[in-house]
UniProtKB/Swiss-Prot annotation:
Belongs to the polyhedrin family. GO terms for molecular function: structural molecule activity. InterPro entries: Polyhedrin (IPR001746). Major component of the virus occlusion bodies, which are large proteinaceous structures (polyhedra), that protect the virus from the outside environment for extended periods until they are ingested by insect larvae. This is Polyhedrin. Keywords: Viral occlusion body. Pfam families: Polyhedrin. It comes from the Viruses. The keyword Protease does not apply.
Length: 249
């Protein structure tokens, strides 16, 4: 009688059952990832211990909101018409933009910077508002800081990768050069002697000259009220109250 278990058709797997318990088997990728995770956690703990002593200092994420006093100097207020899909040049210190009557609009004796203070930063602030009610669009802006002195910008450009203006329709640019502020003293005397000399020799010697374009994402021509101003971030050597247990600045 033929037997299915004869030597001719014998298989070593017949009659045997293998049961693998995953409790004792680990995926190789899981083992490597787990080891790397533990190694990264140990490195992170060591880094945090080294940085613990910095917890007593405060740093402002937005330099505009950081320590110091903001002093605003309005340059001009104007109404500009902006056509769809275009941006209009509103600030150009390389050309004749500010060599006109707007200089005299804010020249006064009550300049806020006095001798015992220094300029930490200068911000160009452009505030935009629609002149017509019930308009639904967003403001766009672009700027450049490192233009060649001989560069002549166009009055109108096409919209290419602009940035949307944030809260309060205010576009704010820090004009500080790399390395920080402007340790210039006796600013009030420089200002009262010659305002144009103050701008050229004091401000633009330590800060960048900006070129700014503004526009809208509207499909129609829009009328915009612009208020352009310089905001000086003033360092106070004797602050009224310290920010924290560490140094104030």
């Amino acid at each position: 009688m033929y037997s299915r278990y004869s030597a001719y058709n014998y298989s070593p797997h017949l009659g045997k059952t293998y049961v693998y318990d995953n409790k004792y088997y680990k995926n190789l990728g899981h083992v490597i990832k787990n080891a790397k995770r533990k190694h990264d956690a140990l490195e992170r703990e060591a880094d945090e211990r080294e940085l613990d002593h910095l917890d007593k200092y405060l740093v402002a994420e937005d330099p505009f909101m950081g320590p110091g006093k903001n002093q605003k100097l309005t340059l001009f207020k104007e109404i500009r018409n902006v056509k769809p899909d275009t941006m209009k040049l509103i600030v150009n210190w390389n050309g004749k933009e500010f060599l006109r009557e707007t200089w005299t609009r804010f020249m006064e004796d009550s300049f806020p910077i006095v001798n015992d203070q220094e300029v930490m930063d200068v911000f160009l602030v452009v505030n935009m508002r629609p002149t017509r009610p019930n308009r639904c669009f967003r403001f766009l802006a672009q700027h450049a800081l490192r233009c060649d002195p001989e560069y002549v910008p166009h009055d109108v450009i096409r919209i290419v990768e602009p940035s949307y203006v944030g809260t309060n329709n205010e576009y704010r640019i820090s004009l500080a050069k790399k390395g920080g502020g402007c340790p210039v003293m006796n600013l009030h005397a420089e200002y009262t002697t010659s305002f144009e000399s103050f701008i050229d020799k004091v401000i633009w010697y330590n800060f960048y000259k900006p070129i700014v374009y503004v526009g809208t994402d509207s499909a129609e021509e829009e009328e915009i009220l612009l208020e352009v101003s310089l905001v000086f971030k003033i360092k106070e050597f004797a602050p009224d109250a310290p920010l924290y247990t560490g140094p104030a600045y």
